């Protein structure tokens, strides 16, 4: 069995300077990160999803992290391959449903998009040309789009990716980039990640013109036509850390989807005394819904 790209050492290394740690039983990498304002560290699953195996030996993985003086572990599971909820709840201190992911599965009977989306695709194709590209060949244009997105959405933390991250993704054989061009100029791009019958929407960004012309619509259409045979496509969930009733991105994805899946946010306290101390330092309740509580934005 091939290693899932989100669990691979090549992908984990893309998050440098964060240090990858291999969890042997979970068969995945997590990232060691400093706890701001302290000498301590905790760990998180790789963005956007932590792909892990249902192996009771995960308790040994937790012990290894504890011996490495890691305070906590937090991870968002992959709704297409995650262990069942009972396993997650039995092994993690925190396990709660996280986001609804919008999925396209051509084997299901309702495989047509919404009428609204078909109309948007038709209109956008009059203004742009779409095709598969090598991300490395368009990295400057992509970075301009992505840094604009970061600034516009005030994206901070791990998702404020450096150029080196995209350079690493660009050479991964599992990554496919579909781009839209207007009068020959890069207007929108979308990176998709593939693994054994599963396809994941990874990251997307557009120029102002690309957004105005709604180039994302034909890009999604291209992805579905390219991957529909023998694949389930995960478009991801709504924007932000929590779901909202008023979310244009959710409506956009839902219009292409014909199924829904739910993933989980899982957390584990590896050093209880240290966790309590870090929470006390921030003046937060250790039992707060946000995990780890000491990283909340109180």
Where would I find each of the regions flagged by the language model?
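Short amphipathic alpha-helical segments and helix-helix/interface helices
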Residues: 58-65, 118-121, 163-167, 224, ...
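Aromatic (often tryptophan-rich) hydrophobic motifs at membrane interfaces
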Residues: 60, 174-278
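A structural signal for short, well-ordered beta-strand segments and their strand-loop junctions
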Residues: 72-78, 132-134, 179, 232-236
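A conserved beta-strand-loop-helix scaffold within acyl/acetyltransferase catalytic domains
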Residues: 1-42, 81-82, 87-211, 227
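The substrate-binding groove and active-site-proximal loops of carbohydrate-active enzymes
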Residues: 45-53
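Active-site/acyl-donor-binding loops of N-acyltransferases
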Residues: 2-21, 25-28, 33-39, 90-110, ...
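Non-catalytic accessory segments adjacent to catalytic cores
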Residues: 56-98
């Amino acid at each position: 069995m091939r290693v899932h790209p989100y669990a691979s050492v090549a992908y984990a290394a893309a998050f440098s300077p964060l240090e990858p740690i291999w969890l042997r039983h979970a068969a995945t990498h997590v990232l060691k990160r400093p706890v701001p304002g302290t000498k301590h560290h905790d760990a998180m699953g790789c963005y956007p999803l932590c792909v892990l195996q249902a192996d009771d030996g995960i308790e040994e993985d937790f012990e290894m992290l504890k011996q490495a003086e890691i305070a906590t572990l937090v991870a968002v599971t992959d709704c297409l391959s995650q262990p069942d909820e009972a396993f997650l709840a039995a092994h993690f201190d925190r396990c709660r449903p996280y986001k609804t992911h919008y999925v396209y599965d051509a084997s299901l009977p309702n495989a047509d998009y919404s009428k609204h989306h078909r109309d948007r695709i038709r209109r956008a194709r009059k203004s742009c040309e779409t095709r598969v590209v090598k991300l490395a060949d368009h990295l400057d244009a992509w970075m301009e789009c992505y840094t604009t997105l970061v600034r516009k959405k005030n994206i901070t933390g791990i998702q404020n990716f450096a150029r080196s991250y995209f350079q690493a993704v660009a050479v991964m054989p599992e990554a496919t980039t579909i781009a839209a061009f207007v009068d020959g100029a890069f207007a929108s791009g979308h990176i998709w990640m593939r693994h054994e019958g599963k396809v994941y929407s990874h990251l997307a960004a557009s120029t102002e013109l690309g957004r105005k012309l709604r180039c994302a619509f034909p890009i999604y259409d291209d992805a579905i036509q390219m991957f529909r045979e023998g694949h389930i496509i995960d478009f991801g969930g709504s924007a932000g850390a929590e779901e909202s009733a008023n979310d244009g991105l959710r409506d956009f994805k839902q219009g292409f989807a014909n199924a829904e899946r739910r993933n989980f946010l899982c957390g584990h306290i590896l050093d209880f005394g240290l966790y309590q101390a870090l929470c006390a330092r921030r003046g937060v309740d250790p039992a707060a819904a946000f995990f780890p509580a000491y990283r909340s934005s109180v």
